[in-house]
UniProtKB/Swiss-Prot annotation:
It comes from Caldicellulosiruptor saccharolyticus (strain ATCC 43494 / DSM 8903 / Tp8T 6331). It comes from the Bacteria. Belongs to the cytidylate kinase family. Type 1 subfamily. This is Cytidylate kinase. InterPro entries: Cytidylate_kin, Cytidylate_kinase_dom, P-loop_NTPase. It is an enzyme of class 2 (transferase). The keyword Glycoprotein does not apply. It is found in: Cytoplasm. GO terms for biological process: nucleobase-containing small molecule interconversion; pyrimidine nucleotide metabolic process. Its main location: cytoplasm.
């Protein structure tokens, strides 16, 4: 079976990473969570006590930052200056920093180069905000996965509670709405639906139902049936 690249875009909390991981396991593909890269930069900025609007200081940090993606036993590890930060970058405090640094041109350029290099061999499922429109515009299958802000906040709330974080639903909802605004209005590669993307609204769908829809689209692209 020939291998293709799959781009899965959408707003924060839409379930992109969850679906991408399941799809990668099902197809034997590599999953690249590009948002994790921006979170890694956000984590370093946060730990450096730099405000997210101090662009010059962020660029200084960027020049001395090494980000690597490793695939181990089918799972993605994010290495920040040699340290595995895969779990640390999921802290709630990192989210807004990731959104803010993603608006900086030099940050996006550095990370997009890494992302494009990872996809050269095909067989990659890449999820993010600008994969189908900017990072992998030639991806053979493009999905735009979305859900209402309220549903996305609820999912994030339950996920964080399960991990032991004390979080407030309404604060999460406000943060998600702010991230949506940031992502859609940034100057470089804003969040938008690619012209050739298929939109899936997961608000009232189970994970299994979304996965089935994506699998049907995948097999249609490569000329087979589920």
């Amino acid at each position: 079976m020939k291998k293709i690249n799959i781009a899965i875009d959408g707003p924060a909390g839409a379930g992109k990473s969850t679906i991408s991981k399941l799809l990668a396991k099902k197809l034997g593909y590599i999953h690249i969570d590009t948002g994790a890269m921006y979170r890694a930069i956000g984590l370093k900025v946060l730990n450096s006590n730099i405000k997210s609007n101090e662009v010059e200081k962020i660029l200084e940090v960027l020049d001395n930052t090494d980000i690597q993606i490793k695939i181990v036993a089918g799972s993605q590890l994010v290495l920040l200056d040699g340290e595995d930060v895969t779990e640390k970058i999921r802290q709630p405090s990192v989210s807004m920093y990731a959104s803010d640094v993603s608006k900086i041109k030099e940050v996006r350029e550095k990370l997009v180069k890494i992302q494009q290099d990872l996809a050269k061999q095909k067989g990659v499922i890449m999820d993010g905000r600008d994969i189908g429109t900017y990072v992998l515009p030639d991806a053979e299958l493009k999905i735009f996965l979305t859900a209402t802000a309220e549903e996305r906040a609820k999912r994030r709330f339950l996920e964080l509670k399960e991990k032991g974080y004390e979080v407030d639903y309404y604060q999460l909802l406000d943060e998600i709405k702010q991230r949506d605004l940031n992502d859609m209005t940034r100057e470089l590669a804003p969040l938008r639906v690619a012209e050739d993307a298929i939109v899936i609204d997961s608000t009232n769908l189970t994970i299994e139902e979304v996965l089935q829809k994506v699998l049907e689209l995948f097999y249609k692209v490569i000329g087979n049936e589920v």
